[in-house]
């Protein structure tokens, strides 16, 4: 008896897993877990077994001494502990929300070759990488802010590795008075053409009210095929990653051409961004005559372009058209780089810029990816393009990420000239300081070409009634005076990017080259026809005396002008001057014109004997009849286009290692190569690698 009492006193001091072992039977594992258990190390195996035993014994009530408590005694003890908690002065815990629990996503079911069916419970999201065609068979889903409902056309979705992964979210939708049985019967009928009986039964076992069913199909486009045909660019859409979860869902998604990703890799917007978008969408849809002009500004790599795409898709859910004014020369959204354009967007934007190159309503080829050397021409081009806006649809204005020093003054000029109704200003903890662009701040600041609303000298007293009677000097009267009245909206950004000060320029250059490739893909025949090499396509022959020439970004001697045009990216433009009166050419312009640009092309050759330019372009012939000017800027043909010319023997045309840097304009022609060489000569210290600790 004494020994038993002594044992009872020692029991509480023992470890929990020892008590669990005595109270419960020995843990039985199946064959596969036992095999995994043998492969673990001794310490990991011991830790795993302890956790399993603790989980197995979690439901047992303990009494000092190791004996189980009867049901009545356990109930009495629970009531006693509840009374103690009620009488305790400590604050109560937060109540658990009483809303319905979010159900898990069932496995994706194969629906034939290159097709799969996905069931999403309400509130769940499917994050993926790759490209596919999304059709909503039942319910309603949202991708990148655009809502896809049952019966609507399929949408091409591009979730690339150059940007954040996209997510298919199941959203709430209105249901007429139907029982769960009727909804289930309707969904089963819709699934009959796609799934066999067994897969249909397994999928419908996870059916719940307000869930959505999506059909994922393999997507093949000439744009994707053309981009991945170049060496080193296939990783943009598909990346083979080693996985340990090889099951039926893995093979079903692989046949579609996508891969399931973790939720944390998907696109995430802050609450402030959603609040701003909700207000802007409400203003655009509820008021019939309201066409807000929304200017989005902030420093670079803070998420402005992502916000603009999401906002466009949100607006297209309620309005038929959204206008878009592109003022960012380096990272354009719908055109090749170096352009200022105005577009009418009627289709959702479900991918990065190089997947949705479109024809603008009005476009001017500025010819550079930055305006730092010619602010006045930049302002004049924006005024020229903005004059075509008819105020029939909401307008989104995208601005540059240069908001320091002169860039801030230039932004103030844009706000005054474009007169937006709403200004969305982005900020983050890691971005440089940017003042709040309130209407009062803008009115009290001088821009580069506009001046503040009032310039009253401070004479030691404040008498606003005498402000109009004061006389100013001539230099104080220069520049137009424009007052602003808009609503300032703030977005706190938590956008995470892999760009740094060292790799930002190379990263941006890759995105610009992808945009050019996306534009050139319009030369390819539609799928399923095979791709054709660019040097195998028939170019247009343009006489010297039919078009004028101008090099925008540099001063080139007239004797070397054709060297600069050959094998260059050219803008096909329309000028008001008549150039048909010249007997021979080339015809050179003395200054860069501000004129309409109908598209772009490649000057793949010049015939000096017949005096012909050979132009390769996707612009239709009816538009080419009006082209009478070729503009050459700092935007170059991607190197992969020149290097990957198949079917050629010997040296590749336009690719050489012997280059004369003394030619006028030679340094501007290869500015990117020079900057890369300068970067290597600086001798930056090698990056240090640290081991991660957990």
From Swiss-Prot:
Cross-link Glycyl lysine isopeptide (Lys-Gly) (interchain with G-Cter in SUMO2), where in sequence: 477
Could you say which enzyme class this protein belongs to? transferase
A Pfam match is CLP1_P
* Protein name stated in the entry: Polynucleotide 5'-hydroxyl-kinase NOL9
What's the family? Belongs to the Clp1 family. NOL9/GRC3 subfamily.
Q: What is its EC number?
A: 2.7.1.78
Which function does this protein serve? Polynucleotide kinase that can phosphorylate the 5'-hydroxyl groups of single-stranded and double-stranded RNA and DNA substrates. Involved in rRNA processing and its kinase activity is required for the processing of the 32S precursor into 5.8S and 28S rRNAs, more specifically for the generation of the major 5.8S(S) form. Required for the efficient pre-rRNA processing of internal transcribed spacer 2 (ITS2). Associates with LAS1L to form an ITS2 pre-rRNA endonuclease-kinase complex and is responsible for the transport of this complex into the nucleolus.
Species per Swiss-Prot/TrEMBL record: Bos taurus (Bovine)
Post-translational modification N-acetylalanine, affected residues: 2
């Amino acid at each position: 008896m004494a020994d038993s009492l002594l044992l009872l006193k020692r029991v509480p001091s023992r470890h929990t897993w020892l008590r669990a072992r005595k109270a419960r039977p020995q843990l039985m594992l199946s064959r596969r877990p036992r095999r995994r258990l043998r492969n673990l190390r001794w310490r990991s195996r011991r830790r795993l077994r302890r956790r399993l035993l603790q989980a197995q014994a979690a439901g047992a009530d303990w009494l000092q001494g190791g004996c189980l408590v009867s049901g009545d005694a356990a109930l009495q003890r629970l009531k006693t502990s509840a009374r103690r908690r009620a009488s305790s002065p400590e604050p109560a815990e937060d109540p658990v929300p009483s809303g319905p629990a979010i159900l898990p996503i069932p496995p994706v079911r194969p629906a034939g070759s290159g097709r799969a069916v996905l069931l999403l419970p309400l509130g769940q999201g499917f994050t993926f990488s790759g490209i596919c065609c999304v059709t909503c068979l039942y319910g309603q889903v949202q991708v990148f802010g655009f809502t896809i409902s049952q019966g609507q056309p399929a949408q091409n979705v591009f979730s690339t590795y150059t940007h954040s992964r996209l997510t298919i979210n199941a959203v709430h939708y209105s249901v007429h008075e139907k029982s769960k049985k009727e909804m289930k019967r309707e969904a089963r009928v819709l699934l009959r053409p796609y799934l066999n009986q067994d897969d249909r039964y397994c999928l419908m076992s996870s059916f719940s009210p307000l869930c959505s069913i999506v059909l994922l199909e393999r997507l093949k486009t000439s744009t994707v095929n053309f981009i991945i045909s170049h060496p080193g660019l296939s990783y943009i859409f598909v990346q083979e990653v080693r996985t340990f979860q090889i099951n039926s869902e893995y093979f079903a998604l692989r046949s579609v051409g996508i891969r399931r990703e973790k939720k944390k890799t998907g696109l995430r917007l802050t609450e402030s961004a959603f609040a701003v978008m909700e207000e802007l969408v409400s203003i655009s849809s509820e008021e019939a005559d309201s066409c807000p002009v929304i200017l989005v500004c902030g420093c670079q790599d803070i998420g402005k372009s992502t916000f603009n795409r999401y906002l466009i898709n949100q607006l297209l859910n309620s309005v038929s058209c959204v206008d878009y004014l592109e003022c960012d020369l380096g990272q354009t959204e719908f055109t090749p780089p170096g352009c200022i354009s105005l577009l009418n967007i009627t289709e959702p934007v479900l991918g990065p810029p190089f997947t949705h190159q479109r024809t603008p309503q009005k476009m001017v080829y500025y010819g550079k990816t930055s305006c730092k050397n010619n602010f006045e021409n930049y302002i004049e081009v924006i005024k020229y393009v903005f004059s075509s806006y008819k105020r029939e649809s909401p307008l989104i204005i995208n601005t540059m990420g240069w908001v320091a020093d002169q860039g801030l003054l230039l932004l103030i000029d844009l706000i005054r000239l474009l007169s937006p109704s709403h200004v969305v200003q982005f900020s983050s903890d890691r971005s440089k300081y940017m003042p709040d662009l309130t209407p009062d701040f803008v009115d009290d600041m001088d821009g580069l070409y506009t001046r503040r609303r009032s310039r009253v000298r401070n004479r030691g007293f404040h008498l606003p009634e005498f402000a109009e009677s004061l006389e100013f000097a001539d230099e104080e009267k220069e520049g137009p005076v424009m007052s602003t009245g808009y609503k300032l909206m703030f977005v706190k950004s938590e956008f995470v990017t892999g760009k740094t000060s060292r790799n930002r320029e190379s990263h941006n250059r890759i995105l610009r080259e992808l945009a050019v490739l996306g534009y050139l893909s319009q030369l390819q025949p539609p799928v399923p026809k095979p791709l054709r090499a660019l040097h195998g396509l028939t170019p247009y022959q343009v006489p010297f005396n039919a078009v004028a020439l101008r090099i925008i970004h540099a001063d080139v001697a007239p004797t070397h002008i054709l060297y600069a045009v050959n094998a260059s990216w050219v803008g096909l433009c329309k000028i008001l001057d008549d150039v048909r009166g010249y007997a021979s050419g080339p015809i050179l312009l003395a200054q860069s014109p501000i004129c309409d640009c109908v598209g772009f092309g490649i000057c793949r050759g010049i015939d000096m004997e017949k005096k012909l330019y050979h132009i390769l372009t996707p612009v239709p012939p009816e538009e080419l009849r009006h082209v009478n000017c070729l503009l050459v800027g700092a935007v170059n043909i991607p190197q992969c286009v020149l290097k990957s010319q198949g079917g050629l023997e010997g040296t590749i045309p336009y690719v050489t290692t012997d280059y004369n840097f003394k030619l006028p304009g030679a340094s501007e022609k290869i500015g990117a190569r020079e900057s890369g060489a300068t970067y290597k000569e600086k001798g930056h210290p090698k990056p240090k690698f640290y081991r991660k600790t957990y």
